[in-house]
A protein has these predicted regions:
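Short glycine-/acidic-enriched loop or helix-start segments at secondary-structure transitions
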Residues: 23, 73, 97
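Conserved short histidine dyad/triad with adjacent acidic residue
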Residues: 37, 42, 87-93, 98
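C-terminal interaction modules
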Residues: 14, 47-51, 80-82, 93-170
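Short, small-residue-rich packing micro-motifs
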Residues: 11-20, 29-78, 83, 109-118
Length: 170
C-alpha cells in the first residue's frame, strides 16, 4: 500500500508486519503486535526545517536511516516508554515489551562495520552504542541504561529472531 504519512499517524500491527518508507528513504519495519506513533514528520530540502519525531510503544522494529543527514540531528527524536534515542546515521532494532522495557541493538552496515552511532538516554544517564551488535536494555526511565554489551549474533540470526525480515529462501 502507498499512502502519505502525516504527523500523529499511528501504525499498529496485529498478526502482520509493516514497512514504512519516508521521503528521505528512512525505513521502519514493524513486526507483529507493534505500535508506532509518528509524532511529527516534516521533509524539507533545508535540513534546519526538516523534522522526524517517533514514539515506539510496543513490539519490535528495525530502523534504517536514509538521508537523515538532510535533517539536523537535533530535529530527530525517537522515544520508547523508557528511553530516548538520538540517531546518528544508523541501522538498529528496538524491542519494547508489555511493561515498556526496551532492548536496543545497533546493527552493522553491509560490510559488517558500525552503521553509525546511537545515544540511549534515560532520566539517569546516557550510553553510546557505536559497535556492530552492541546492545543496551532499559527497564524504567528513572534508571540508567545497562552498560553496552556486544551480542554474539549475526544479522541473519537477528532478522530471524526478531522476525524483522522473512527468512531467506534456500
Amino acid at each position: 500500500l502507498k499512502f502519505a504519512i502525516q504527523s500523529n499517524d499511528e501504525a499498529i500491527t496485529t498478526n502482520g508486519r509493516m514497512a514504512i518508507t519516508f521521503l528521505d528513504d528512512s525505513t521502519v519495519k514493524l513486526t507483529e503486535h507493534s505500535q508506532l506513533l509518528i509524532d511529527e514528520y516534516i521533509y524539507d530540502p533545508d535540513p534546519s526545517k526538516a523534522k522526524m519525531a517517533l514514539t515506539f510503544g510496543l513490539g519490535t522494529a528495525r530502523f534504517i536511516t536514509g538521508n537523515l543527514n538532510r535533517i539536523d540531528k537535533q530535529n530527530i527524536t525517537l522515544k520508547t516508554p523508557t528511553a530516548n534515542i538520538a540517531i546518528r546515521g544508523t541501522d538498529f532494532t528496538a524491542t519494547v515489551d508489555e511493561l515498556g522495557r526496551s532492548l536496543i541493538i545497533l546493527l552493522p552496515d553491509a560490510f559488517g562495520l558500525s552503521s553509525g552511532e546511537i545515544l540511549v538516554t534515560t532520566g539517569m544517564g546516557t550510553v553510546t552504542l557505536n559497535k556492530p551488535y552492541q546492545a543496551t536494555t532499559v527497564s524504567v526511565f528513572e534508571s540508567k541504561p545497562s552498560s553496552p554489551v556486544i551480542l554474539d549474533l549475526t544479522l541473519d540470526m537477528i532478522d530471524n529472531m526478531l522476525i524483522v525480515t522473512p527468512p531467506k529462501e534456500e
